Swiss-Prot record:
Stored PANTHER family: HOLLIDAY JUNCTION BRANCH MIGRATION COMPLEX SUBUNIT RUVB, PTHR42848
Keyword DNA repair in record: yes
Binding site for ATP: 26-27, 68, 71-73, 134-136, 177, 187, 224
Enzyme class: hydrolase
Enzyme Commission no: 3.6.4.-
Catalytic reactions of this protein: ATP + H2O = ADP + phosphate + H(+)
Region spans: Large ATPase domain (RuvB-L): 2-187
Origin organism lineage: Bacteria, Bacillati, Bacillota, Bacilli, Lactobacillales
Identification of the protein by name: Holliday junction branch migration complex subunit RuvB
The species this protein was found in: Lactobacillus gasseri (strain ATCC 33323 / DSM 20243 / BCRC 14619 / CIP 102991 / JCM 1131 / KCTC 3163 / NCIMB 11718 / NCTC 13722 / AM63)
Single GO term (MF): four-way junction DNA binding
UniProt keyword terms in alphabetical order: ATP-binding, Cytoplasm, DNA damage, DNA recombination, DNA repair, DNA-binding, Hydrolase, Nucleotide-binding
Amino acid sequence: MKDVNDEERIIGAESNEEDETIELSLRPQLLAQYIGQDKVKSEMKIYIKAAKQRDEALDHVLLYGPPGLGKTTLAFVIANEMGVHLKSTSGPAIEKAGDLVALLSELNPGDVLFIDEIHRLAKPVEEVLYSAMEDFYIDIVVGEGQTTHAVHVPLPPFTLIGATTRAGQLSAPLRDRFGIIEHMQYYSIDDLEKIIQRSSVVFNTKIDPEAAIELARRSRGTPRVANRLLKRVRDFAEVKGEEAISLATTKHSLHLLEVDDEGLDQTDRKLLRMMIENYGGGPVGIKTIAANVGEDTDTIEEVYEPYLLQKGFITRTPRGRSVTQKAYLQLGYPPKKAE
């Protein structure tokens, strides 16, 4: 069976090299410039102001939520608001405890260490963080054989900002050491429209207001998807010679890209059709779904499910996942018969 993810998804929220380049050019510098996530922003504004008044490092921050919602961007904004440097890495990149020790030893007082995908830290690496986060020291084992001994190394007060799409996979000892925990939510259409309008200025292109709204509606509540779709729709508009991206061109180009009015792409539709046609709409176990689409269960839960759940196309039950009436109607199937 062909893997549903053989081709990169235009609406996939996972980052690629082009996204990282785009996001760097669009990155706001201050909380006031950061669009959306109002609850998170208002709370962080207070925490940052209090830390600066006390002349202390900001408490450790955990940002969690689906991919593409601006966790990395917010980490950079927080560091900028605090007036400190940020050192960025990721869980998979820190392969051994010594790698983390090297990063920590380079920090100055108040600096931010940002670890993306923090749930993927190896256990020995994570354990080094415990004393570093709580008491700002690490113990380094030096020597060999009978001369082996631990050296107590103090660290300057610093802020760890961790980002994760899988908060439930964090161990309790690590999670409990974060004083600030913020849940990043999907963006509203209004906020996405503002992001699209702002991005269009950076991209040196114009977009009609109704076209921006249509693009926002199909962007899956995710700024990364909105910016990616804006770039593709801009290509269509430029080839047509439009001075500003029109609603008609937006609808036409998204139709060709197979992104429907709910933001579903062919991958979403394949997954939902598989559940409907092969399993009567469910419930279907997560392992069965993963086997049918050629992915592992983590990818299903982290990449495919969040938006489908949030939009009400599937439900999660103790017996597995079920397709909703809304999904049947969206895909053109007769209404699901009541059991």
